[in-house]
Every structure is written in structure tokens, then in C-alpha cells.
Amino acid sequence: MGKLQDGIAIKRINDAITTFKNYKLDELEQGGSMAINTLSNVRAHVGLAWPAILRNCLIHTSSHLGFMKFMIDIATTWKVGAFTLLGSVGDEDPFTDVDLIYTKTCLHLGLKDNDFLQFPEEFAYEANSFLEAQSMNARVDMLTGVHNIEDKYVFRMQSISKFLKAYYTASEDVAYLTGFIKPDDSKDSILSAELLKAQVTSEVLRVRNLITTKIQKYINLYEDSQLPHFRQAALSYTQDWDVDGGVPAALPQPDITDDESPVTNPGPSAPPVSKGADQPEDEEMIRKKVETSKDAPPKAVPSGNVSARGIPAFLEDDMSEMDAPDGFHDYLTREHENNFDLAQLGLAPSV
């Protein structure tokens, strides 16, 4: 594959960031989705750098919401091969430094290159381990792997469910996540920081609500399915999310946008909507507050030894048994001699 020139490398990451910035829920359900096609194309050309690109999209404020919608889509779609979108293509890394290229891409797009969410160290490590593991385990050999795709689907959904649960737990303290926001004493800086804090808070609350709502919908649809792989995945979700007792929510929930309409009778696991004092403020409220207060209180700096990107190095020895590399290779193509319908399976093409 060889190393990519900076211009081409920036173009690949540019496509990923832009796609996640505009990602709508249920993109996977649409035939010929431009967003899914773009992500598949990026994935096919970045080799083993794919999990690192996804990691950066997870923690950067511009792409965080879209990335999490993407993960929720994979966790709740009927397309059993959609998880292959998390797998890398090939055995080479064409990037010399993914984080550096990501920083250059942010500058190219007019984004701040230091606006990364500050996740707790435990989740940062778990997220990195998860993405690295899926890079190998979400691959499918078209010659042999497609015949046991349902079994592989169940294991992948169990892993994704645990990732979403870890995110749900780690996102309870939004003040910690926004600890990177440190304005100076100018009104413009204070206003910008408050707006970004409100944006991040609103997006995190929205993701938390989407996770529980969509997981509950999946359980309702498939817990009694005649297809064993759907039934097993629904059972796993039921155990992970304790739907009978409800998933506790420490934060209020925002209003649902058009592409995130609530399901009918979502059940007890959907956290209640709160309109109390902790509800995120809109831009006008924040602007007035900043304009009328010259002495803004200092921003609290969260404790913990976590870097701006908060991701420790992944160690293969720490991979769980379920996520150990299983030897599958990615030879996915759009056509196969047995004429499998990859669109129906939801298998991501590798070329």
C-alpha cells in the first residue's frame, strides 16, 4: 500500500470528519446512503489506521455526535454484516502519524485542533481497546466467513453493547468531559467557551437518550424473534442494560431532533425528560449571561492524568478473550461467485 502523501491522507480524514459531522440516525437502513458509502471508501484506503481515525472522530467535538449515532446504528440494525464497517482493510498502515494528520485536517476544515473531549482514563483505554479489537475481529472472509456471519454478528453486538454501556457510564459527569474548555478573560472567549460547553452537554445527553431508546426498541422487536442471532443479541442487550429495572440516568435529556424521533412505548429503560434547572441553556441565554457578568467564575479543571486526547496505548495482551484476533481476512468484494447480496447482509465492501 505504501505511505500516503499528506494531501491524500488529509483528504481521507477530511471525508471521515465531514461525514460524521453530518451523519443522520438510521443511515444504515437507507439503500445507497452517501454517508455509508463515503465511510466505506475511507475505510478501504486507510488500512490499519482505520481504528485510530475512528478514535479521533469519537473524541473530537465536531464529529462526536455523528460517530456515536453511527455506533448506535450498527448496534441496532437488522443488517447482520454492518459491523464489518468497523474492520480494517489489509495489513498495512499508510499513515506515518495519524494524530498529526488529524490535527492538520482539523486546521484545514477550520476546526480547533485541541477540542477533544476529556473522557475518564478508564473509558479512554476501553474505547481504544475496543476499536483496535474490532479492526481485526470485524473482518469477514468472503470465501468462508459469510457462512457463519450470524454467529459472528452475535459476538460483535455483545462487544458493541459493552462499549455503549461503558460510554453511558463515563458520560454521566459532563463537567469532566468539558474540562478541556479553558477561556481567557475576554468576553468573546468566555462566550465561545460557554457555547461549546452547552453544545457538548446537549450532544452527550442526546447520545445517552438515543442509546437507551434504540436499544429498547431493538429488544422489543427481536426478543421473541424466530431468528436465533437476533434473539441472542436481544437477550444480551437485556442483560447488559437491565431494561426491567431501567437504566439510571444522572443527567436530564434534551428534546429529540427530527432524525431522532422517539420510539412508541420505549419502555422503562428510556430515561425521563427533565426540564429542570440543569437543562442546557440555549445560545441567547448564554450570551446574555456573559454580557451581564464581567467577572466570570474560573473554570474548574478536572483531576486526573489524562492527555488532551485521553487515549493510552493499546496493548494486545489486554484484549479480552472474546475480542482476540480470530484470523479472519478481509476479502470483501461487491460480487461473489455464489451471488451473495452484500447489501442485504449489510457487509461493507473492501474495495
Curated annotation (Swiss-Prot):
GO terms for cellular component: host cell cytoplasm; viral outer capsid. Its main location: virion. Pfam families: Phyto_Pns9_10 (PF05878). Keywords: Capsid protein, Host cytoplasm, Outer capsid protein, Virion. The keyword Cell division does not apply. Residues 285-297 have a biased composition (Basic and acidic residues). Residues 246-308 are annotated as: Disordered. It is found in: Virion; Host cytoplasm. Disulfide bonds: none annotated. Minor outer capsid protein. Belongs to the phytoreovirus minor outer capsid protein P9 family. This is Minor outer capsid protein P9. It comes from Rice dwarf virus (isolate O).
